[in-house]
Amino acid sequence: MRYYLTPEPDPQSDEKIADINHLYQTAQERAERGEATLSTDEMTGVQALERKHPDLPMHPGHVLRREFEYERHGTLSFIVNFDVASGRVGQISSGSTRNEADFLAHVRATVDAGPRVVQWHFVVDNLNTHQSESLVRYVAEESDLDIDLGVKGKSGILASMQARAVFLSDPTHRIVFHYTPKHASWMNQVQIWFSILSRKLLKRGIFTSVAELKAKVLAFIAYFNRTMAKPFRWIYQGKALVA
């Protein structure tokens, strides 16, 4: 089977790939200068599932056995920062939604927790909440910019998502967003960590409530940072990927 409605490539794809590759390659060097490089994204609709019947543990000659029926106790969305230089998971936010206000609150909490950081770099995808009016206003405030931002949907920097993304990507600001090419969120290193979380915890976990789900995710993050964290070895250089 093959897809046939192939989307148009991002015209800025090569530029964005080069920018993110350079960001990853220089993350540790810039960390020594007081800059932070964070790979940030949402993990949405994480289900708190409780199995109706207990697992049968593995023993010699038998794999762990699990029944397929479960009870669903709600969902959570997580916003996670993966520190590219250290390989550690930092700021994490959770809740029932993942809207513009949630993302802004997450970025604000991240920046507030690092007052000595001289410049913040966030690698994000092209979700509309990552290019919002409130985010533009916050970055302008944090960068001490006293300028006319225009009117959302009508004029100036706030006129369109594209104009807002250009502003948010300005390397002279204290907070800089680096956008992955369209349909290339795999370039965001936090996606690798999401896979680790899914394999190590979520797929085998039993959660009787969203509170227990959150507690176990936070406990796993503490365990990961203590025993497993190290920078990912990023070798992709922008060459075409062949299936």
Predicted regions span which residues?
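C-terminal anion-handling pockets and recognition modules
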Residues: 173-179, 183-184, 191-243
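Charge-mixed, compositionally biased segments that are often intrinsically disordered regulatory tracts
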Residues: 1-72
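Electropositive, glycine- and tryptophan-enriched low-complexity nucleic-acid-binding patches
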Residues: 58-118
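RNase H-like polynucleotidyl transferase catalytic core
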Residues: 65-70, 143-189, 206-207
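Mobile genetic element proteins and their domesticated derivatives, centered on retroelements
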Residues: 39-41, 81, 107, 125, ...
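Acidic/histidine-rich, metal-coordinating catalytic segments
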Residues: 117-130, 153-155
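Short glycine-/polar-rich loops that comprise or flank the Walker A/P-loop
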Residues: 34-35, 118-119, 171-176
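Short catalytic/ligand-binding loop motif for oxyanion handling, primarily in non-cytosolic enzymes
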Residues: 46-48, 129-133, 186-189, 241-243
